[in-house]
């Protein structure tokens, strides 16, 4: 599996790009331009290249920027260029995670079709105990594997879905009907098409 990493400048305080690069044998991108030779790092190319994007850990600030399109760093700019499934693994203090602003931003990301990997409960960096720690990397990999395995379960199948109102004849003159926008039918069709 070929991976590329994008790290925010503040993320370098937690893990060095050298460590990430050593783990994947690939360079780490943190700025729009390479500090070594001035080469431009194309967020668009990353968006076209990837099969999925995983943002782990996702801070409250990053989640807020993603939800509202604040493209002030390479990570969020890359996210905004993605045409593939995006998985977000929040990691923050329990009060920050539970805050209505954070929950609202997560709801916005869900409404965009992003997959939220719920944080685990346990001891946090603040030494408090509760929900907010990033899910274990092994669990995140399991979520990705399950997602991509599920994407193939309807391959080659033909499915008929009706959308809109239905009318059932009672007799030659009367019928029973229902009002329907067809939204559920379209949602089912989209879900089947993605699998």
Predicted regions and their residues:
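A cross-family phosphate/adenosyl-ligand binding-site feature
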Residues: 3-87, 94-182, 186-195
